[in-house]
Every structure is written in structure tokens, then in C-alpha cells.
Regions:
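Positively charged, low-complexity intrinsically disordered leader regions
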Residues: 2-19
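Short, glycine-rich nucleotide/cofactor-binding loops
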Residues: 28-39, 68, 109-112
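Histidine-anchored nucleotide/phosphate-binding helix
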Residues: 40-53, 58
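Short internal beta-strands
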Residues: 56-62, 133-136
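Glycine-rich loop at the start of a catalytic domain that most often binds anionic cofactors/ligands
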Residues: 68-78
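A glycine-rich helix N-cap at a beta->alpha junction
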Residues: 76-110, 114-117
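A short aromatic-anchored loop/beta-hairpin motif
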Residues: 119-128, 133, 142
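Glycine-rich, aromatic-bearing surface loops/beta-hairpins
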Residues: 147-174
Length: 174
């Protein structure tokens, strides 16, 4: 059974983890990209899995750290440069104002469909029972500690530890 929450930051749907159809299912999502357009796929999939009652873990590594770094998580960018899916001439992507314009347009489009910004989306995922993990190697490479990361990150762990925590999970690399 699901319930609707009056709290805007709480999940709209609270999953029923007692559903026999999802019992024992796990999803592990590796978030390795730090651009606005690549931040959302992992979060959307995590949110969907949690809504189905599936145990969900996100592992932020390499540029994916931008999503959980307190200094950068509110300022992820979207660039047209090198992105053929935008169907625009590549030369336009190099113009100084183009990244700001593309980022603004994407943020507006995301907001129009009711998807929260990155920090609120992470909060919603955690409130729904999701687990957030930071990669030890990436933290060390960037000289970051837990104090630098989004408060709901459960810990900085090694890739081996993540594999152990998510044993038997379906794995998605984004």
C-alpha cells in the first residue's frame, strides 16, 4: 500500500517493502557523470525502483561526485559541446554564453514536469529508503572528506565495499 505525504520534501509515494514481488530485489546504480543531463537518469531510476519497493543503492564516483559535493551540487551544468543529441551545430556549443543558456533551458524543462532539483531529489530518495555512497578513490583523488559531501551520504567506501553491500543486485552504470 502507498500513502501520499503532505510534506513537499518527503516522498510522494512511500513504498511497501513487504510486497512479495519485490522481496529480495536490489538495484545498484553507479553515478559517474557530473553534468546536469547525466545526473538525472540515475536519480530517476533510483526513485522509480524505490517506488516499487526495491532496495536501492547509489554509488557516486569520478565526476558523479559533483552531484553530492556541497560546493557543486547546486550548480551542475549542461553543455551542447560534443553532445550530438542536441541536434545543433557543434560550433555553437563553444560560444561563451551557450552553456549557461542550455543549462537554464534544461532546468526549466525539468521543473515543468515536476522533477525536483538535485539536492531535493537526493533528499526524496533518502526519505524513501535509498542509500547514498561515495567512492573512496574519488574522494581521495579530489581531497574530499565526508564534511564536503551532501549530509545524507552514508559514507565514503571502496568499490569493493560497494560490491559487498550490493551483492546480488542489478547493476546500472550511468
Amino acid at each position: 500500500m502507498t500513502t501520499t505525504s503532505p510534506d513537499a520534501l518527503a516522498p510522494a509515494v512511500v513504498p511497501n517493502f513487504d510486497d512479495p514481488a519485490t522481496e529480495g530485489r536490489k538495484l545498484a546504480i553507479i553515478c559517474s557523470k557530473g553534468t546536469l543531463d547525466m545526473a538525472y537518469p540515475g536519480l530517476v531510476l533510483a526513485n522509480a525502483a524505490l517506488g516499487e519497493g526495491i532496495e536501492t543503492h547509489l554509488f557516486f564516483t569520478f565526476w558523479g561526485f559533483e552531484m553530492i559535493n556541497k560546493k557543486t551540487m547546486n550548480d551542475l551544468q549542461f553543455t551542447l559541446l560534443g553532445n550530438p543529441a542536441t541536434h545543433m551545430p557543434q560550433g555553437l556549443g563553444g560560444l561563451p554564453w551557450m552553456t549557461a543558456m542550455a543549462t537554464s533551458k534544461l532546468k526549466k524543462s525539468i521543473a515543468e514536469v515536476g522533477v525536483p532539483e538535485i539536492p531535493e531529489f537526493l533528499e526524496q530518495i533518502v526519505a524513501s529508503g535509498g542509500h547514498l555512497w561515495a567512492c573512496r578513490m574519488s574522494a581521495d583523488m579530489n581531497h574530499l572528506t565526508e564534511d564536503d559531501l551532501y549530509d545524507q551520504v552514508e559514507g565514503i567506501i571502496s568499490a569493493s565495499d560497494f560490491i559487498e553491500k550490493t551483492e546480488g543486485a542489478q547493476l546500472l552504470f550511468i
